Structure formats: structure tokens, C-alpha cells
Amino acid sequence: LQFLYNMHERNELVERVYAFTDESGAFGWDIENPNVSTHFIITAIIVKEPDLEGFTQKAEALRKKHFQTGEIKSSNIGGNHARRLRVLADLQGIPFSIFSVCVDKKKCIENMSMKGLQYKKTFYKFMNNIVHRELRRAFEKITIVADEIGGNEYMQSFCQYVTSHQDMPNLFGDAKFSFENSKNDVRIQMAD
């Protein structure tokens, strides 16, 4: 019983973190086409639970200041580098960390030994699972909230994929995963 009590006590001391994820770059292998991205990036904005409320309030203030009624989206800034620098400067006071995985699709093409990656759904699942696996390894108590991708059926299959490809569960681990629409969640917009 002492061991179980110590386990519970330890779990209470471990701080929960939240990771809000979004992707940049699209699926597609015709990278010579200027409309097809050469890289695929998945970013997680990581926030400690005690900072979550302040993070959300400050992110919403940043959204209102720089994007008015729209979403925080890098594509809305485009090539306006002065505006991008103003947004980045205002990120300074917001409590969060960043974890990103950047995939050079040229390297994937050169090493296309995993034939399944040529299919869109498989590609998205595989790439997102890399991020999710690393986050679960780094944080014992984590809630991952990803931007919705595809339809409901795809998101359900993605959740099953993540669950079936996770490492062996650890006694102290507590990982949760869900999808939210970034249009309704400024926290996910911050990952854009």
C-alpha cells in the first residue's frame, strides 16, 4: 500500500502540460510545383497548467491586436515581415514553449523506403505521431489538443493510430488527446 500511496503522491506533484498542435505545409510530392510546399512542419505550443488561463487571455489579446476578428494565421501575414516582427515581439510576454518537427520532403523523396508515406492519410498520421510520441515521452502528464484535420472518420482513425503506435504505457504517465477546430480555439491558432 505504501508503494501505491507514493505513486499517487508523485502523480500529484507532476505538473500537467497542454500541447496545442497545428501543421504548416501541405501533403504532396510534386515539390517542383510552386504551389506545393517543400517542407511539412508540425508545431506544438506547450503550456503548463498553472499558466493556461493567462496564456489563453494573452493569446486572445494578441489575436485582437494583430488579427482583429480573424484567426491567428501565418498565411494572413504573408510577406509583410514588419507585421510578422510586431507579432513576434508581442509573443515575448506569453508563457509557453515551442516544439516543432520540420520535415524536408526532398529528403523523404530521396529515401522513400516507406511506401505508405506517399498516401495522404498515412503521411499525416505518421508525421503527427512523431510529434505526439516525443511529447508523451517528454511529459508524464500531457493533454494534446490538435487542430481538426479531415472529416470525423479520419480523426477517429487518427486517434486509433496514435493509441496503437504509442510506446509502452508508463506507470506514472497520463496522456490525453483530442481535436478542436482552430477557428474556435486561439490556443491552437498560436501554433500556426
Where are these regions (language model features)?
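Phosphate-ester processing/binding pockets and catalytic centers
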Residues: 1-192
